[in-house]
Regions:
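Membrane-interface helix-loop junctions and terminal tails of multi-pass membrane proteins
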Residues: 1-262
Length: 262
C-alpha cells in the first residue's frame, strides 16, 4: 500500500534537520517564557501563592516547554543544560554558543518586561521588593529584616550553603534532563520528569538563595535589585559547574548513547 501524501510530507519533515536559527529562536522564546512565568509568579504573586506556587510555576512552565519547543531545539532554556549536552557531544561548540546567547537574550527580555509591569504598581519599591533576584547573606530570602524591609537584622544562608546547593541541584537537573532524553530511555513523559524535578529543586532551595540552577534566569533580573549584581557571579559559575558534574555522573553511571531522542 503506497503512503499517503501526508505521510510522505511527515517523513521528509522528520528527515530534514532543523535550521540553527530556528533552534536559537526557540531557545530565546522558551527562556523568555520560563523567566516570565517563574520569576513573574514570584514577583507579582509570590505573597499569594508562596514558595509552593512559585515552584509549580517554574516546574509546569518547563514541563510545557519540553513538549512545545523540545522537538525544535531540545528545550535547554538553561546554559548549564546546554553545557551538559555539549560535553556529551550532542551539539557542536558553535551551536552551543548560539544556544547560550539566545537564552541570555530571552532572559533579559523577560526581565525588561517583568520590571515594566512591576513598576506600574504604586506600592512597588525596587529597593525593598526587588525582582526575584538570587542572593546569599543579607540578600538571602531567609535574611531577617526590620519592619520596613530595608534593614537586615540577621543574615540568611551564607555563600558556602549557596555554592553547595547550586552545584548539587544543578547537577541533579542536568542529570535528569540527560537521562530523560537519550535514545535508550526514550521516555514519552520526559517533560513530566524534568518539570517535576525543577519544581522540587525550587521547593528545596527557594529559602536558601531564591533558586537559580540557571545562569540565564539569574542574569535576567540581577541588575534590577539592589545588591544582587555583585553576587550574580555565584549564580553563573556554580550552576555551570553543576552542569559539568551532572554530565559526568550521567556518563559514568550509564555510559549510554550520546544521542538525544529525536
Amino acid at each position: 500500500m503506497s503512503p499517503t501524501a501526508q505521510e510522505v510530507v511527515e517523513e521528509v519533515t522528520e528527515l530534514e534537520p532543523t535550521p540553527e536559527a530556528k533552534k536559537w529562536a526557540a531557545e530565546a522564546l522558551g527562556t523568555f517564557i520560563l523567566v516570565m512565568s517563574g520569576v513573574g509568579t514570584a514577583v507579582l504573586a509570590g505573597q499569594r501563592v508562596g514558595p509552593l506556587g512559585v515552584a509549580l510555576a517554574f516546574g509546569l512552565s518547563l514541563l510545557f516547554l519540553v513538549y512545545a519547543i523540545g522537538p525544535i531545539s531540545g528545550c535547554h532554556v538553561n546554559p548549564a543544560v546546554t553545557l551538559g549536552q555539549l560535553l556529551l557531544g550532542r551539539l557542536s561548540v558553535i551551536s552551543a554558543v548560539g544556544y547560550v546567547i539566545a537564552q541570555l537574550i530571552g532572559g533579559f527580555l523577560a526581565g525588561i518586561v517583568l520590571f515594566a509591569i512591576a513598576k506600574n504598581l504604586p506600592s512597588y519599591d525596587r529597593a525593598v521588593d526587588g525582582l526575584g533576584a538570587n542572593g546569599w547573606g543579607k540578600h538571602s530570602p531567609s535574611a531577617v529584616r526590620g519592619p520596613l524591609g530595608q534593614v537586615v537584622i540577621a543574615n540568611g544562608y551564607g555563600l558556602s550553603a549557596t555554592i553547595i546547593i547550586e552545584v548539587m541541584l544543578t547537577a541533579l537537573l542536568v542529570f535528569v534532563v540527560l537521562a530523560s532524553t537519550d535514545q535508550i530511555s526514550d521516555i514519552p513523559l520526559a517533560g513530566l520528569s524534568i518539570g517535576v524535578t525543577l519544581a522540587v529543586i525550587h521547593l528545596i532551595s527557594i529559602p536558601v538563595d531564591n533558586t537559580s540552577v540557571n545562569p540565564a534566569r539569574s542574569l535576567a533580573v540581577a541588575f534590577y535589585q539592589n545588591g544582587a549584581g555583585p553576587q550574580v557571579w555565584v549564580f553563573v559559575v556554580f550552576p555551570l559547574i553543576g552542569g559539568v558534574l551532572g554530565a559526568l555522573v550521567y556518563g559514568l553511571l550509564f555510559g549510554r548513547s550520546r544521542e538525544m531522542v529525536s
